[in-house]
């Protein structure tokens, strides 16, 4: 990264990064190759039909030239069996190196964002900003804020249909025209390759296991675009009143695309070029909070009385996605519910607002009286059924939760098998440490323990009872009880997982910066 930063700083300004020449540098594909090998949470080596995992710059250059050619590989395929066999070999040959280009695109697109992030923290003089990235830091925020709110909107952010929209969003950040031009070519060809996987069962497996770093970054830029305009409308609705206003955004391309925007429930906003002819004061709410992670978001509001304000924002999102990103969104993607009666799923937890009624005796001179007090607390529990479904998809158990062996790991050494199962147990134990009912994890622990024993028994052609008797009842136990001393902004982790009373204690690990794959049920 230092070498890349040195290259970019040779220009006159950091605002004019030329990323296209970096596509022809050997070390870019070495970085992409190393990242793709080390990024999977489940160590399952992937082989692409005889091709090794070594990248070649010459072959990548040939693939780039082929993408630019008018007669692409896909258009030259006919229905003859011989040509279909040739296409099959060339397809996976091209797929492997297209995956390398995809990873390289992801690395290069991250450069401008990472440089801005580093420069930002240098300006505000924050040296250790890595601890600020913990996704568990969201839950103390929710505990502090949601206890005073009444309604929450559970939002499932839709995926854009056209890749061209994602490239257009990147134009606000990257001014390298050749790089963006080639990115459009690549995404178009990638979409064509992906569309041919319907009848190739084996091909679907390969694509399902590959690392989509570039597409995650494109999706995050799209989510940032949504949040940028949402935050603008939210800010203007809070500060502005019933008068007309002029231009508020520099991003004029948003308003040039539509003439008017009509929202149901007494909201009508006319957008004509750069002017608001109608104010947003009906959206005013001083108690509103928005939190997003990956493809899900929550919008919480005080919402006194009826949830009319939440419905207004709901229809605003629908029309915003329709007119700005040109795709329809289904109503089920935004679900509004009162916090006192319903729970919402977010970041691998089922969260709800508990209300405890207490009677407090007050003494005033010679008189005493009782006062009813309501104490609200955010309760976070582990969704066991959803977690079992995730384990079922990963082939650790059946849909009903019956443990099964992991055949793909049966060829590994015993130490590696124990390490793989132990790593998953440790991740789940640490991630769900903030649950108010840790006893729900005992069933997950049972499934992983039996699945590990069945995998070892399958490898050695023995019985599960034999291995459980040999390894004892402490199989994988150390991975649930082990605690590491990790740098934290608030406190070190010292409380074991299953000590007496620890099932009631909630611990938020501030070193978790990435959601566990088994937690991301979607």
Swiss-Prot record:
Single GO MF descriptor: RNA binding
GO-annotated cellular components: chloroplast
UniProt keyword Acyltransferase present: no
Listed name of the protein: Maturase K
The keyword Transmembrane is assigned to this record: no
Places the protein is found: Plastid, Chloroplast
Domain of life, source organism: Eukaryota
Record key words, sorted: Chloroplast, mRNA processing, Plastid, RNA-binding, tRNA processing
Stretches that traverse the bilayer: none
Similarity comment text for this entry: Belongs to the intron maturase 2 family. MatK subfamily.
Function: Usually encoded in the trnK tRNA gene intron. Probably assists in splicing its own and other chloroplast group II introns.
Organism: Dianella ensifolia
InterPro entries: Domain_X, Maturase_MatK, Maturase_MatK_N
GO biological process, one term: mRNA processing
């Amino acid at each position: 990264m230092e070498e890349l930063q040195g290259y970019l700083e040779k220009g006159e300004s950091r605002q004019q990064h030329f990323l296209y020449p970096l596509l022809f540098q050997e070390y870019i594909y070495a970085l992409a190759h190393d990242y793709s090998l080390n990024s999977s949470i489940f160590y399952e080596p992937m082989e692409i039909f005889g091709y090794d995992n070594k990248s070649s710059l010459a072959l990548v250059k040939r693939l780039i030239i082929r993408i630019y050619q008018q007669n692409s590989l896909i258009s030259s395929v006919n229905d003859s069996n011989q040509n279909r066999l040739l296409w099959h070999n060339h397809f996976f040959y091209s797929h492997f190196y297209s995956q390398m280009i995809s990873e390289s695109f992801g690395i290069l697109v991250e450069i401008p964002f990472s440089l801005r992030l580093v420069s930002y923290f240098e300006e505000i003089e924050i040296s250790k900003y890595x601890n600020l990235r913990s996704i568990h830091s969201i839950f103390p925020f929710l505990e502090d804020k949601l206890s005073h709110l009444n309604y929450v909107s559970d939002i499932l952010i839709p995926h854009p249909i056209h890749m061209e929209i994602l490239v257009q969003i990147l134009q606000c950040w990257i001014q390298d025209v050749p790089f963006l031009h080639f990115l459009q070519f690549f995404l178009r060809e990638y979409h064509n390759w992906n569309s041919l996987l319907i009848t190739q069962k084996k091909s679907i497996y390969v694509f399902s296991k590959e690392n989509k770093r570039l597409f995650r970054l494109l999706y995050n830029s799209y989510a940032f675009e949504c949040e940028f305009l949402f935050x603008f409308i939210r800010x203007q609705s809070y500060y502005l009143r019933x008068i007309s206003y002029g231009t508020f955004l520099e991003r004029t391309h948003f308003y040039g695309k539509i003439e008017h925007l009509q929202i149901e429930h007494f909201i009508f906003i006319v957008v004509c070029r750069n002017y608001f002819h109608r104010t947003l004061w009906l959206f005013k709410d001083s108690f509103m909070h928005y939190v997003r992670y990956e493809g899900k978001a929550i919008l919480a509001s005080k919402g006194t009385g009826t949830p009319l304000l939440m419905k207004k924002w709901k229809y605003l999102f629908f029309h915003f996605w329709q007119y700005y990103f040109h795709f329809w969104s289904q109503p089920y993607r935004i679900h509004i519910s009162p916090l006192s009666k319903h729970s919402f799923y977010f970041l691998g937890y089922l969260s709800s607002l508990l209300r405890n009624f207490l009677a407090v005796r007050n003494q005033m001179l010679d008189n005493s009286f009782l006062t009813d007090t309501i104490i609200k607390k955010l309760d976070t529990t582990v969704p066991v059924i959803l977690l079992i479904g995730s384990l079922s998809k990963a082939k650790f158990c059946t849909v009903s939760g019956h443990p099964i062996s992991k055949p793909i790991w049966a060829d590994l050494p015993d130490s590696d098998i124990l390490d793989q199962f132990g790593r998953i147990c440790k991740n789940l134990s640490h991630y769900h440490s903030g649950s108010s009912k840790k006893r729900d994890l005992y069933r997950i622990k049972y499934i992983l323990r039996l699945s590990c024993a069945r995998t070892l028994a399958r490898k050695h052609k023995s019985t599960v009872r034999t291995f459980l008797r040999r390894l004892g009842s402490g199989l994988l136990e150390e991975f649930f009880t082990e605690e590491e001393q990790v740098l934290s902004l608030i406190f070190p982790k010292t409380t074991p997982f299953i000590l007496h009373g620890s099932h009631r204690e909630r611990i938020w690990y501030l070193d978790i910066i990435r959601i566990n794959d088994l937690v991301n049920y979607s």
